[in-house]
């Protein structure tokens, strides 16, 4: 049998593992893998949710998950074998089961709506958009038990809607799923001596940087007693630019995120911050009394209306354009694949008719087909799950009705196919675009008090189910490349959903407790501002027809934003079709739009991270390629994990001993000195 891939001189991957027998189901779904999954699930949910609540988006954490999963499970397996508690060998298949558990857990945590839809239901976010609130459109507290049930319902909807597509996407259409392919190659390499050495080096780097980041967070904490205190409020470029939110807050998280994001994303964010906070908003402030009258920073009929609706317009327009491009591309590719299939009468028969197919592909397809699940099982399960959700969702949230849930669950498999197919082609899930468009439709459909909460629920269900589904297919691609049973992967996805359903609501409660007094979670002054929460709520308001109360020329500026977005996206598309390089230097309009609403401070930290990586690559390219993701993960995890002791200190009323704050010279210092003297304190004279 031919054991080569393309070029006979190249060694087959599966031939290298030929001596290792394929493990059974019980050797894949092991208690030790589940134990490590619980540990890593908690850590990465904590870190991922924290980043999302701080910045509005989460960089790809698949690589840190993959490296740490391999390292921790290998160490645990070796110790258990040393203590003679098990004879089960550590295999790449068990490694893949662990990875899909953790990634599914993380994906559900960051797409379930904690930083978007669920936070957007509360009074804190609602007051940033209006002063006169309808209590039927407000939910300030959702019991933890309800959150657990809600997350399990939407997570399982994503898993069940994905299963019927497994063979179609992986075998019939042979889609690439780039991230899944990379992880598959990585796992295969890790289970060789050379790959294990690199993995060990990466893990050591993560722990070293983690310790430094954690220590830096402790040091910063001592100077942060009070609002606007500490290094996070350091006026790097002076107090005037600080008022415009242009400063470096020395956040290891943002620097790490900047190292993981492409340079075009980092500088796109900075460009958006300069355009909005540097030019547009100062100009609009000069129109106070002419274009708008209110001084309220939250009302949509004031300056806030421009901020919210211009940013929403940019994001939604860019998302819809990219969605149309992806759907068109997917339809064209789908047509060509169907034409090829009609000529070959299906891939299964193609295997038997083409004995020259390389050894790796034949081996992988045989494994996949031998352990696939009959189609009627997931279809029947999804129908039953839809019925359960139609009863459970309205019982927990009376703003949404059973027929709203039924229509949404009917659309999820159809839209999920489009989203997963596009992910297989481009590695890009547009679930967030669907999550912005669906509440607009449902808000217009419901159009009565309570519609905002119902539409936000629709947004959360849409994003979580579609994203979990598409990313589960990425994991299945990795499983296909490592000869891991699809049934074991589905078991891992179910376990990941169950784990996330319990862990992520508890972590969310910890973040609520950790928020500083006077700056609760979701507020603009909070450590966790959840910048997208207001945007999602604003989309629901627009859907209900609430644009009539906007300030003067707001709609016209939104139309200009639409036209600019169309022009930029058209230029990018033409550049791609013509083979120019111009599109490589044009950032996404969604990236540019984020600072319009969230502020500009984090963009400088991210650019700093990107510049550090660029400098590192100039000095030592190989070291940067191997270890940069590990350094970024250490920076993010170190600061992220300090949130736990910080929250505990806050719960027990243990406050930092000092406040480092910067004030302009003159009368302000005298006022502060007078205040401190009346309180028994003093400002040291210099």
Swiss-Prot record:
Main location: membrane
InterPro entries: OPT, YSL-like
Pfam families: OPT
Bridged cysteine pairs (disulfide): none
GO cellular component terms given for this protein: membrane
GO molecular function, one term: oligopeptide transmembrane transporter activity
Membrane protein topology class: Multi-pass membrane protein
Keyword Transmembrane helix on entry: yes
Transmembrane portions of the chain: 27-47, 53-73, 96-116, 151-171, 203-223, 264-284, 308-328, 373-393, 405-425, 441-461, 488-508, 554-574, 596-616, 629-649
Family: Belongs to the YSL (TC 2.A.67.2) family.
Protein name (database record): Probable metal-nicotianamine transporter YSL4
Organism: Oryza sativa subsp. japonica (Rice)
């Amino acid at each position: 049998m031919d054991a080569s891939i393309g070029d006979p001189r190249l060694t087959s991957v599966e031939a290298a593992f030929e001596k290792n027998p394929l493990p059974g189901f019980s050797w894949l779904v092991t208690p030790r893998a589940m134990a490590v999954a619980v540990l890593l699930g908690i850590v990465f949910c904590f870190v991922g949710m924290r980043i999302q609540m701080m910045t509005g988006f989460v960089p790809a954490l698949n690589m840190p998950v993959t490296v740490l999963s391999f390292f921790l499970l290998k160490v645990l397996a070796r110790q258990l074998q040393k203590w003679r508690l098990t004879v089960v060998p550590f295999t790449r298949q068990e490694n893949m089961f662990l990875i899909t558990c953790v990634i599914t857990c993380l994906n559900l945590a960051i797409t379930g709506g904690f930083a978007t839809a669920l936070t957007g239901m509360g009074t804190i976010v609602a007051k940033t958009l209006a002063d006169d609130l309808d209590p039927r459109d407000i939910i300030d507290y959702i019991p933890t038990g309800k959150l657990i049930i809600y997350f399990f319902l939407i997570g399982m909807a994503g898993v069940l809607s994905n299963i019927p597509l497994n063979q179609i996407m992986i075998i019939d259409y042979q889609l690439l799923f780039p991230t899944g392919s990379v992880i598959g190659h990585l796992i295969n390499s890790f289970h060789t001596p050379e790959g294990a050495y690199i993995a060990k080096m990466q893990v050591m780097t993560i722990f070293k940087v983690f310790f430094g980041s954690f220590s830096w967070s402790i040091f910063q904490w001592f100077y942060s007693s009070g609002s606007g205190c500490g290094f996070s409020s350091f006026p790097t470029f002076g107090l005037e630019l600080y008022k415009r939110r242009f400063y470096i807050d020395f956040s290891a998280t943002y620097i790490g995120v900047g190292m993981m994001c492409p340079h075009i994303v980092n500088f796109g964010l900075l460009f958006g911050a300069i355009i909005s906070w540097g030019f547009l908003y100062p100009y609009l402030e000069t129109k106070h009394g002419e274009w708008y009258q209110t001084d309220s920073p939250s009302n949509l009929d004031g300056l806030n209306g421009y901020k919210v609706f211009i940013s929403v317009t940019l994001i939604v327009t860019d998302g819809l354009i990219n969605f149309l491009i992806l759907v068109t591309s997917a339809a064209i590719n789908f047509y060509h694949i169907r034409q090829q299939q009609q000529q070959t009468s299906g891939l299964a028969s193609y295997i038997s008719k083409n004995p020259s197919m390389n050894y790796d592909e034949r081996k992988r397809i045989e494994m996949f087909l031998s352990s696939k699940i009959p189609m009627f099982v997931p279809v029947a399960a999804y129908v039953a799950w839809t019925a359960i959700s139609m009863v459970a969702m309205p019982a927990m949230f009376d703003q949404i009705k059973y027929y709203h849930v039924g229509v949404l669950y009917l659309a999820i498999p159809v839209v999920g196919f489009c989203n997963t197919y596009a992910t297989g082609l481009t590695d890009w899930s547009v679930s967030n675009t669907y999550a912005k468009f669906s509440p607009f439709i449902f808000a217009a459909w419901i159009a009565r008090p309570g519609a905002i909460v119902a539409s936000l629920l629709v947004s959360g269900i849409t994003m979580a189910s579609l994203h979990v589904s598409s990313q589960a297919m990425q994991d299945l691609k990795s499983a296909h490349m490592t000869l891991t049973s699809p049934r074991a992967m589905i078991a891992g996805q179910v376990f990941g959903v169950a784990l996330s359903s319990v862990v992520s609501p508890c972590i969310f409660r910890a973040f609520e407790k950790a928020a500083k007094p006077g700056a609760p979670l979701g507020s603009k002054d909070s450590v966790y501002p959840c910048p997208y929460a207001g945007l999602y709520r604003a989309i629901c308001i627009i859907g209900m027809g609430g644009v009539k109360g906007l300030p003067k020329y707001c709609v016209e500026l939104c139309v200009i934003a639409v036209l600019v977005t169309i022009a930029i996206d058209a230029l990018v598309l033409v550049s791609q079709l013509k083979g120019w390089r111009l599109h490589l230097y044009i950032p996404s309009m969604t990236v540019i739009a984020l600072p319009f609403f969230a502020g500009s401070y984090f963009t400088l930290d991210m650019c700093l991270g990107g510049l550090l990586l660029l400098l590192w690559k100039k000095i030592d390219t190989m070291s940067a390629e191997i270890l940069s993701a590990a350094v970024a993960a250490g920076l993010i995890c170190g600061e992220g994990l300090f949130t736990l002791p910080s929250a505990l200190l806050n719960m027990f009323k243990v406050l930092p001993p000092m406040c480092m704050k910067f004030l302009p010279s003159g009368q302000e210092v005298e006022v502060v000195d007078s205040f401190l003297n009346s309180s028994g304190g003093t400002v040291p004279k210099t």
